[in-house]
Amino acid sequence: MNSVRAANRRPRRVSRPRPVQQQQQQPPQQPPPQPPQQQPPPQPPQQPPQQQPPPPPQQQPPPPPPPPPPPPQDRNNAGERDDVPADMVAEESGPGAQNSPYQLRRKTLLPKRTACPTKSSMEGASTSTTENFGHRAKRARVSGKSQDLSAAPAEQYLQEKLPDEVVLKIFSYLLEQDLCRAACVCKRFSELANDPILWKRLYMEVFEYTRPMMHPEPGKFYQINPEEYEHPNPWKESFQQLYKGAHVKPGFAEHFYSNPARYKGRENMLYYDTIEDALGGVQEAHFDGLIFVHSGIYTDEWIYIESPITMIGAAPGKVADKVIIENTRDSTFVFMEGSEDAYVGYMTIRFNPDDKSAQHHNAHHCLEITVNCSPIIDHCIIRSTCTVGSAVCVSGQGACPTIKHCNISDCENVGLYITDHAQGIYEDNEISNNALAGIWVKNHGNPIIRRNHIHHGRDVGVFTFDHGMGYFESCNIHRNRIAGFEVKAYANPTVVRCEIHHGQTGGIYVHEKGRGQFIENKIYANNFAGVWITSNSDPTIRGNSIFNGNQGGVYIFGDGRGLIEGNDIYGNALAGIQIRTNSCPIVRHNKIHDGQHGGIYVHEKGQGVIEENEVYSNTLAGVWVTTGSTPVLRRNRIHSGKQVGVYFYDNGHGVLEDNDIYNHMYSGVQIRTGSNPKIRRNKIWGGQNGGILVYNSGLGCIEDNEIFDNAMAGVWIKTDSNPTLRRNKIHDGRDGGICIFNGGRGLLEENDIFRNAQAGVLISTNSHPVLRKNRIFDGFAAGIEITNHATATLEGNQIFNNRFGGLFLASGVNVTMKDNKIMNNQDAIEKAVSRGQCLYKISSYTSYPMHDFYRCHTCNTTDRNAICVNCIKKCHQGHDVEFIRHDRFFCDCGAGTLSNPCTLAGEPTHDTDTLYDSAPPIESNTLQHN
């Protein structure tokens, strides 16, 4: 459609007559300069007029030759022009220490001289291989007789005695081809004619650039700093590369063509007043298609490019700021089929319609690139004030431009729009402050976008949708009003090594069945989640750093899926990964750490496979599972948290298997309020509040775990909880093995409980568990203790080799027992009593023996004070004493806390005045964090 519209609306081009071609038809007595290979053979030294481009009179050697005919006004007073930089005027006296040893001195006469410069001296002259510079062919060697002849006086004076400053002044009036011919005269002229100051002045008069513009190959232009360039004369080198071209310079064409003698030798330069004329002229003249657009504002020209032309701005300073092409009615530039190798660079391109909201402008753009063309757009500033459409539109099969170093900013619509199977390479562009997305990719568009700076957009940074694709690498995307990168409706981009940060909402937003691969990016400091995945989307998030977000790291909700793998997620204000509302991602091999909230938060029926992650040093729980969620957590390392390792609450379910859970400030695992997870084959150790805590009607199937080295009980069961524990090894705890109290229940079956500091199993306060086929042995206190009106069913248990004894039942406890084996226990309590020792000797802050304890009315002790039977017999003999009960206790007499000293105990110990039961665990409170 675009091609048809362009063909119908394109005006007829009429090229201007070119006086240069007329000059070539003049009589042969004034032919233009010929290329080097067509020059006549060099003449002997006694014929100086044929060797020098501006030959002086033969009879007046002392004065310099008269200048050529007066140049036009812009060349008058070439040494004092206002538009020539001051450093050129200051250095025009000669090459100085740069290029020549000739400083304010004259050459002495030489008896002999060669007929032409040496090969080394030619290196300073023209090095171009093009026919545009009229170099003489290398001189042939002259005979010895010719070398013995004396040079003519004028030639000697010009070549050997005239000061460098005077020669440079003469050379300053020459054009480029004359300078190249002068460089062929002798070594001294070669050095002076290649003076960079001469070429800089000449270069700026033609091209206006204040820095050399290099053009080493088609489609490649770049400016350099002359001081840093390896070539001794970059101005001349650039002149050679840019020599053959057309110049759009309004007002100058008439002057140029009306002074053919003044510009003799510049047949390879064409001048036009408009870009349209230049486009037609270079095609009719069979030029290479190089067009220089000089400083100015060019308005409402119809620029439809359907040939491989090269169009570049030419201006001093920042070139693109001073060459402005604008259209108010139609697309400013349209590239059509046939413009495969076209180049447009170093200019400002604007689309500025009068009615900025008109719908018919929806198809109008600053740049429009259509099917089967691959132009290069380089170093351009692109602006559009139209509120519909886009600034740059690339559409159609075979549309494959290269857009690089451009600034697409401050547009009232989309910055760059790639659609309908278009491709292309887009590198090093600045895309900012656009009203809509910085980049749209739609309908199978598949660009390669590298190192672009996409920021401060008033919408999303990059938006791929409706099957849009693309490869985005090393882009900096930040401070956009919506997400930095949005993927929607089956779009499938690849985003690699980009920085996506400081978004006013999120970093990456994938929704409505979006896909995509996000690999090795840095995603940080976004106001919402670093990555959002929702509504059946299934992206791959691999190897990214996602950190310091004002909310969470990765947020998956609304049936979202995706692979979250190998990421480093840390320092976020909310959960590192959040999974909710039936979402089911795969989360593996990530590091989730140092968050201000939890590590992984699964809620509202969230699912997912969470495996082989390392979750550590988070402020709240390492993993939260709640409100009907059923994730599978497998082979993770969850450690060093400031609260719980894994926390199931409010009907949280799921599978927790083969994990290492260790070194948490609270319990390794907590289960409460109807939660019923399957916890199996885990290693749970180093918890400051115990291994597993099941409370507030918690459930759970806890099987084949190893629970050890916890500061408190290996497993706590309390407050109407009813879990099942099978085949676990619970050992080496710094408190009891399993503590059940406050109405706790549960089935404990086939567990090995050994080497714990307190009772292997402590049952207290109205609890009623079932213990079946357990082995409880090698404990540092009792095997099983039942107290505080608790009951239990004990069937087929083996209780042996425990220090205090096998089974201890407090007063008022009724137990159902069947087929238990209680054997070979050390019975340290009975032995201490039989030896008359105070039971304080065998107790400690973590180990309370169960025996008869008393109070002494004579010593005014209270119910909170307990005295062992031996202290009653020895220390309180004859006192009014009262038997309290048979229970776990700590002898206050032996501890030295009563008024009378104990005669059986050793050093007194400060009494904590606590109840004689295991210290209660710390329960997590989640309400304030939900």
Curated annotation (Swiss-Prot):
Residues 156-202 form the F-box domain. This is F-box only protein 11. GO terms for molecular function: protein-arginine N-methyltransferase activity; ubiquitin-like ligase-substrate adaptor activity; ubiquitin-protein transferase activity; zinc ion binding. Residues 1-150 are annotated as: Disordered. At 9.5 dpc and 10.5 dpc, expression is restricted to developing heart tissue. By 11.5 dpc and 12.5 dpc, detected in liver and subsequently in muscle by 13.5 dpc. At 14.5 dpc, still detected in heart, liver and muscle and also in the developing secondary palate including the nasal, medial and oral epithelia of the palatal shelves. At 15.5 dpc and 16.5 dpc, expressed in lung, kidney, heart, liver, muscle and adrenal gland. At this time, fusion of the palate shelves has occurred, with expression confined to the nasal and oral epithelia. Residues 28-73 have a biased composition (Pro residues). It comes from Mus musculus (Mouse). Residues 17-27 have a biased composition (Low complexity). One of its GO terms (cellular component) is nucleolus.
